[in-house]
Regions:
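Short beta-strand-to-loop capping motifs
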Residues: 99-102, 145-147, 189
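Active-site/acyl-donor-binding loops of N-acyltransferases
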Residues: 2-11, 129-161, 259, 292-347
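Low-complexity, compositionally biased segments
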Residues: 22, 97, 113, 131, ...
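A conserved beta-strand-loop-helix scaffold within acyl/acetyltransferase catalytic domains
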Residues: 11-63, 67-85, 125-130, 134-142, ...
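Acyl-donor binding region in acyl/amide transferases
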Residues: 55, 62, 77-141, 256-316
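Secondary-structure boundary/capping signal
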Residues: 36-40, 119, 236, 315-316, ...
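Short C-terminal domain-edge/linker segments immediately following a structured domain
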Residues: 89-90, 100-103, 151-154, 173-178, ...
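Residue-level marker of positions within ordered structural domains that often coincide
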Residues: 1, 33, 103, 148, ...
């Protein structure tokens, strides 16, 4: 069926994630199973909804059969009343999109209508969502690190392809050990809640030092990270990893695991050890221990920085933009976003 036929035949229902019946949860998992992405999972949606009000899921059905799920959120009751939505998890989320059965396609305007939305601003929509009929205007690169043969084999390949980078990393690692003691790495920190509190504090201090917008300033966002840290689901599991040199904390990372992939989300390192490249050493340790954890990929999310390219084995693309239906609310949303972007550019 083409987009128009599907749009006219589809029925929709807007529900809170916790109200989605087991049959719906199972269908969601089945749709996501061919390529599990933690940020598109039902478990992620439920965890966010436990801390953030006004999270909704649009359940799309065809002849009474679920064919797609579209999670999103409202920033406030005012935005909900005006039909102005945003991607689930806001600006901190690494992925956004429609979870649907194979072959399902829908135009963005129809998806908004069925979801009761006038407009929706989004980032991190993967380009493969074009197969669903969805797209955006702005394009941004992202990077994968794939190591199907395990971490040591990956590092040997890195030695051959970028000898200077590999040798420099190993030199800094040896210098760190000489200065502070042997390295100890925990893929799953034994005190996840306490370690996450420290990571959040250190990450917020990093944002202040660098002048970057603090996405952890919101108490709801911090609570969401803790909820995700407690989440243990095949398509979304919280993972907090730490590395020490002797008794000195070197670096930590909190991310989400989906099947054999780890979403590299919130890394932070000890600023007093910056000359040792602690972030690089942490990532190397995670890769070296990945095979024992059943991991074969690290997803670095959107962004094309040198630090991401250093480890990258392949590139993919995201897009962002503003979906709209005609109306006053959508026009006001567009103007508001333009003002917000202008204010941020002046900071």
């Amino acid at each position: 069926m083409n987009e128009l036929t599907k749009a006219t035949a589809i029925t929709s229902r807007l529900v809170s994630p916790q109200d989605l019946p087991q049959r719906g949860q199972d269908a969601w998992r089945q749709f996501l199973a061919p390529r599990p992405i933690a940020f598109l999972s039902y478990a992620y949606t439920k965890a966010v909804a436990s801390c953030v009000p006004l999270v909704r899921v649009c359940r799309l059905e065809l002849s009474g059969r679920p064919v797609a799920y579209f999670p999103f959120q409202y920033r406030s009751r005012f935005h909900a009343a005006a039909g102005i939505g945003q991607c689930l998890g806001g600006e901190a989320s690494d992925y956004f999109g429609l979870i649907a059965e194979d072959g399902f396609r829908i135009a963005a305007e129809d998806l908004l209508r069925l979801s009761g939305l006038k407009s929706l601003f989004f980032t991190q929509l993967t380009e493969d969502q074009q197969d669903r009929g969805l797209g955006g205007a702005r394009r941004e690169a992202g990077h994968f690190i794939d190591f199907p043969e395990g971490g040591p084999a990956f590092w040997e390949s890195k030695r051959r392809s970028d000898k200077h980078f590999a040798a420099d990393t190993e030199r800094r690692e040896r210098a760190l050990v000489r200065a502070h003691g042997p390295l100890s790495f925990a893929y799953l920190d034994p005190d996840p809640a306490g370690s996450l509190d420290r990571l959040i504090a250190e990450k917020r201090a990093q944002y202040r030092r660098t002048g970057v917008r603090d996405v952890l300033a919101s108490a709801r966002m911090r609570a969401t990270l803790h909820a995700l840290c407690r989440t243990q689901d095949a398509q979304c599991s919280g993972v907090i990893s730490t590395i020490h040199a002797g008794d000195t904390w070197v670096a930590s990372h909190f991310g989400l695991r989906a099947g054999p992939a780890l979403h590299y989300w919130f890394p932070v390192y000890n600023p007093e050890l910056k000359n040792f490249a602690p972030g690089r050493i942490l990532l190397k340790q995670i890769i070296f221990n990945a095979q024992s954890q059943g991991l074969t990929r690290i997803d670095r999310g959107a962004g094309d920085s040198p630090s991401k390219r250093d480890f990258s084995t392949s590139q993919h693309f995201f897009c962002g933009g503003l979906w709209q239906r005609p109306g006053i609310a959508a026009a006001a949303h567009r103007i508001g976003l333009a003002i917000d972007w202008r204010i941020r550019s002046l900071r």
